[in-house]
Curated annotation (Swiss-Prot):
Disulfide bonds join 24-43, 38-60, 62-73, 74-79. This is Short neurotoxin 1. It holds the Pfam family Toxin_cobra-type. The keyword Signal applies. The keyword Secreted applies. It comes from Hydrophis hardwickii (Hardwick's spine-bellied seasnake). Expressed by the venom gland. Its main location: secreted. Belongs to the three-finger toxin family. Short-chain subfamily. Type I alpha-neurotoxin sub-subfamily. GO terms for molecular function: acetylcholine receptor inhibitor activity; ion channel regulator activity; toxin activity. Keywords: Acetylcholine receptor inhibiting toxin, Disulfide bond, Ion channel impairing toxin, Neurotoxin, Postsynaptic neurotoxin, Secreted, Signal, Toxin. It is found in: Secreted.
Amino acid sequence: MKTLLLTLVVVTIVCLDLGYTMTCCNQQSSQPKTTTNCAESSCYKKTWSDHRGTRIERGCGCPQVKPGIKLECCHTNECNN
């Protein structure tokens, strides 16, 4: 009985993947794609315009933004590319 219980605990941990991290893109504007592993469960992409043109920032989480900045948050790996 103890063996069965231990087996169920191990299977549960493997299935839940308790150490899971999200993979988000983190390159800026038109730079080559780069990624990072994040503890957060979402990725973001912020877009705005300034004197240099359209700017894009990508990263982990879902931050609050100022008016005039477009924010897209998503919940799958590399969804903010």
